Amino acid sequence: MFSALTDITDQIDPKFVISYWIPAVVAMSGGGMMWSMMTDFDFWDVWANSLDGVEQIVLAGSMVGMPTILAFFLKAVRRPILMLFMGTSLPRPVAEWGIRRQMRAKDNAYQMILTSEEQDRQFFINKAHQTLERRFPESSARVMPTRFGNVTANLEEYTRSMHGIDHWLWWPRLAPLLPEPMAEITATEVANTTGLLNLSFIGAALGLGGAAMLGLGGGLWTAALKVLVVGLVLAWICYRMAVAQGAEAGRHMHAAFDLYRHEILKQWGLDVPGNREAETALWEDLSRQMLDRSFRAPSTSAAANTAADIAQNGPAPGQKTVDVSRQPTS
């Protein structure tokens, strides 16, 4: 039991608190407030004051333990939440609508450069350039349905165009090799982004779920409207902050690949190529080999060799064969 508690506490570091525990506390607090709105505040006050010392300790422990359990649940489902904000799990009509909106936003950034007045031109050029550089992929074919999806597409496109590296394939192999300062910076930036995305998700869930609970369940339509507005505004603010934070995290990941990608080659016992073209070709070849091993189609060569061996030497002892000439035909 104590070893299990030690394992759990080892996972609760500052990054875990930022990414998952604080959003879980917000979720539990918001849910508790809405539940209290459906009942009587005085009832909960009287009930809490009626508890003895041991019961109050148990209550306090539960108030800490329940958000922690929810935090670990958020960590377990972080990938579906991430895919939702990237837009890859959206229904096709919604995704197509989102891509059209993002294409217009990208075009507007270009138009800002072309149509700005001469005296303000440099300011708008810098602003539009930062938007295009950090928040959109260069290729229009890679535009995603959401702002956050385009930040991740930009992240992937940079490493591919600069070094021939597939970001998602090689980042798990690079991250353990980074020196402590760079590893700490990138992990902190990613934790901040994850925490803001979780807060956005929880804000939307509290707004929609709380409004339904208060309105349909309790008939408190005024309170339901307030909860809906507050929840959705919180979700929108946290999402926009997550997009900006994700772009900042992307800049540090770009720097990590620029500075330390050769550590992977050294770990594999490979020589670092002497020029950029050769290095790009090497990374592309390594990526191709890894993807071929991961997604290799079932090979028919082994089955063909086995069939030829049986036809020449007969089946092995105990091996069953099927005479296809006697099989029924449709």
Q: Which ranges hold each PLM region?
A:
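Cytosolic/matrix-facing juxtamembrane and C-terminal tails of multi-pass cellular membrane proteins
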Residues: 1-17, 234-330
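Hydrophobic alpha-helical transmembrane segments
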Residues: 48-66, 210-231
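Juxtamembrane/interfacial segments around transmembrane helices
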Residues: 65-72, 109-119, 251, 255-257, ...
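Membrane-proximal, non-transmembrane interface segments of integral membrane proteins
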Residues: 79-201
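Transmembrane alpha-helical segments and their cytosolic interface motifs
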Residues: 7-27, 163-226
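N-terminal first transmembrane alpha-helix
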Residues: 1-116
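Cytoplasmic juxtamembrane interface segments
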Residues: 1-11, 129-137, 227
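Hydrophobic alpha-helical membrane-associated segments
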Residues: 62-73, 230, 234-245
